[in-house]
């Protein structure tokens, strides 16, 4: 049985004008996701600006998402960081709060070697009694998990999934080959159907902050054999997907949400507002697709 099938949202963190977490808005976003068929909510991940949340804020966001979701969909806690002890503590607390599973990005900046990466994920897995999803995004972390590391970790009973965002489809095929037991999820919104052709169960998506139902339907169409319909959706939204990564995530998606009236605030420094040129492009894309709150 899969961890989940479908499109999970890498949920943004909304902020007030004075840069504090806007919990009233966060609850609105959770309700919007549930009403629009999201298959999982990822709390306090990269798109949630976890790197600029304090440890207390991070755990508050995770706890809030679990409490407000009320088991209506899966909640996956983003617990990875570049300090193994902190990642273990985040994972333990998330599990205690009731997270369905935890997802840990590879340690960034300090670039652990193979033994260090194996130790990092092993400690996380040993700290919880729920499934663990590895998250590989080399463009942001500077770390690409070797196939040996992935194979070794896949043999730990509760390391059951990987969110893969390298953009390297041949590497994805290698992962499926060496670790067939892992549930695979696309971490790239522009590669959902190609990765599903190699066995992915779905996507953990940035664009689902705006189009959760469309992404859910795309994945379900593919899983149910309506592959051509899924491909049509992938192609239809490709310009939207590109626009959401015109600058560093989550700045474009938050800008788009603000244009649409979600009023989620700005990103925390060092992520600044979009350039005027890119803001205008995002606005034009929103209008092109007729996207509304």
Curated annotation (Swiss-Prot):
Its EC number is 4.3.3.7. Keywords: Amino-acid biosynthesis, Cytoplasm, Diaminopimelate biosynthesis, Lyase, Lysine biosynthesis, Schiff base. PROSITE patterns: DHDPS_2. One of its GO terms (molecular function) is 4-hydroxy-tetrahydrodipicolinate synthase activity. The record marks 46, 109 as: Part of a proton relay during catalysis. Pathway: Amino-acid biosynthesis; L-lysine biosynthesis via DAP pathway; (S)-tetrahydrodipicolinate from L-aspartate: step 3/4. SMART domains: DHDPS (SM01130). SUPFAM superfamilies: Aldolase. One of its GO terms (cellular component) is cytosol. The active site is at 135 (proton donor/acceptor), 163 (schiff-base intermediate with substrate). It catalyses: L-aspartate 4-semialdehyde + pyruvate = (2S,4S)-4-hydroxy-2,3,4,5-tetrahydrodipicolinate + H2O + H(+). The keyword Lyase applies. The keyword Nucleotide-binding does not apply. Pfam families: DHDPS. It is found in: Cytoplasm. Pyruvate binds at residues 47, 204. GO terms for biological process: diaminopimelate biosynthetic process; lysine biosynthetic process via diaminopimelate. PANTHER family: 4-HYDROXY-2-OXOGLUTARATE ALDOLASE, MITOCHONDRIAL, DIHYDRODIPICOLINATE SYNTHASE. Homotetramer; dimer of dimers. HAMAP family: DapA. Belongs to the DapA family. Catalyzes the condensation of (S)-aspartate-beta-semialdehyde [(S)-ASA] and pyruvate to 4-hydroxy-tetrahydrodipicolinate (HTPA). This is 4-hydroxy-tetrahydrodipicolinate synthase. It comes from Brachyspira hyodysenteriae (strain ATCC 49526 / WA1).
């Amino acid at each position: 049985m899969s961890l989940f099938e479908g499109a999970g949202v890498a949920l943004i963190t909304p902020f007030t004008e004075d840069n504090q977490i806007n919990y009233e808005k966060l609850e609105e976003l959770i309700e919007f996701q549930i009403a629009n068929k999201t298959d999982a909510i990822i709390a306090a991940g990269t798109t949630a600006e976890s790197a600029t949340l304090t440890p207390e804020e991070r755990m508050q966001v995770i706890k809030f998402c679990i409490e407000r979701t009320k088991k209506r969909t899966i909640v996956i806690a983003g617990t990875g960081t570049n300090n193994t002890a902190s990642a273990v503590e985040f994972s333990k607390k998330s599990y205690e709060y009731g997270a369905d599973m935890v997802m840990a990005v590879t340690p960034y900046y300090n670039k652990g070697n193979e033994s260090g990466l194996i130790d990092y994920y092993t400690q996380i897995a040993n700290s919880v009694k729920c499934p663990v999803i590895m998250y590989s995004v080399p463009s942001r972390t500077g770390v690409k998990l070797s196939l040996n590391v992935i194979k070794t970790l896949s043999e730990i009973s509760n390391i059951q999934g990987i969110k893969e965002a390298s953009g390297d489809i041949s590497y994805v095929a290698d992962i499926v080959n060496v670790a067939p037991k892992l549930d695979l999820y696309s971490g790239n919104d522009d590669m959902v159907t190609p990765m599903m052709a190699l066995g992915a169960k779905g996507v953990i998506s940035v664009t689902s902050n705006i189009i959760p139902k469309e992404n859910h339907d795309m994945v379900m169409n593919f899983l149910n054999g309506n592959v051509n319909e899924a491909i049509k959706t992938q192609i239809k939204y490709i310009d939207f997907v590109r626009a959401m990564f015109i600058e560093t995530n989550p700045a474009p998606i938050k800008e788009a949400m603000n244009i649409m009236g979600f009023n989620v605030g700005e990103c925390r420094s060092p992520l600044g507002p979009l350039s005027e040129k890119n803001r205008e492009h995002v606005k034009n894309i929103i209008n092109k697709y007729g996207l509304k709150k």
